[in-house]
Amino acid sequence: MTQQFYVSPEQLMKDRADFARKGIARGRSVVVISCADGIALIAENPSPSLHKIGEIYDKIAFAAVGKYNEFESLRQAGVRYADVRGYSYDREDVTARGLASVYAQSLGAVFTAEQKPFEVELAVAEVGVTQEQDHLYRLTFDGSIADENGFVVMGGLADQISDVVNGAWEPELNLAGAMQLALRALATNKEVEELPAAAVEAAVLYRDSESNRGSRRAFRRLLPEDMTRLLTEES
């Protein structure tokens, strides 16, 4: 008869957490920054098609690090949730807090019940009418959720990058200043002062999209030429 080995629940959860952390640590970092013009989302990502940043709904965006197939399935599920809720009730009922709660439940269920946890970390951002009304939520592989103030940093070098951002971030930063700060921070432990525009994926949730762009959709993906222009502007 084969001997059954006992593994305590504490050890099982620790092993799952260590497994997920190692997977996330291999991923390139993402920075999400609240600024005067809106919310800037910047990811170290040279791929032009495999996006780590995406639009969820009118004023809500998503950013992730980790395994692409896992966070892409979560992004698509978030879009479906937002569309159904907005259609069934009202567009104003679709909020970053509600979406983050759904993600937290999904991640927590996978972490405790499935064979392996998701190797992902997520950020859900919602731009407000004023900067005080911005919402930034960070979700980890086990379903833990945190309401962040000002900025979110995720990925393998999150602690070092967060120190750089925290040392220079101010609420008064404009979009150009937020982008320049993010690129300096993402260059941590690299032989350059800041990452080139071609090495990153970037997007913005504009604060005054309805008055400036005539649309409720605040999300806009930034092209390399947009990034080049922003990097030459004064912050």
UniProtKB/Swiss-Prot annotation:
Keywords: Cytoplasm, Proteasome. InterPro entries: Ntn_hydrolases_N, Proteasome_alpha-type, Proteasome_asu_bac, Proteasome_sua/b. Signal peptide: none annotated. Pathway: Protein degradation; proteasomal Pup-dependent pathway. One of its GO terms (molecular function) is threonine-type endopeptidase activity. Its main location: cytoplasm. Gene3D superfamilies: Glutamine Phosphoribosylpyrophosphate, subunit 1, domain 1. It holds the Pfam family Proteasome. The formation of the proteasomal ATPase ARC-20S proteasome complex, likely via the docking of the C-termini of ARC into the intersubunit pockets in the alpha-rings, may trigger opening of the gate for substrate entry. Interconversion between the open-gate and close-gate conformations leads to a dynamic regulation of the 20S proteasome proteolysis activity. It is found in: Cytoplasm. It comes from the Bacteria. One of its GO terms (biological process) is modification-dependent protein catabolic process. One of its GO terms (cellular component) is proteasome core complex, alpha-subunit complex. The 20S proteasome core is composed of 14 alpha and 14 beta subunits that assemble into four stacked heptameric rings, resulting in a barrel-shaped structure. The two inner rings, each composed of seven catalytic beta subunits, are sandwiched by two outer rings, each composed of seven alpha subunits. The catalytic chamber with the active sites is on the inside of the barrel. Has a gated structure, the ends of the cylinder being occluded by the N-termini of the alpha-subunits. Is capped by the proteasome-associated ATPase, ARC. Belongs to the peptidase T1A family. Component of the proteasome core, a large protease complex with broad specificity involved in protein degradation. This is Proteasome subunit alpha. The gene is prcA.
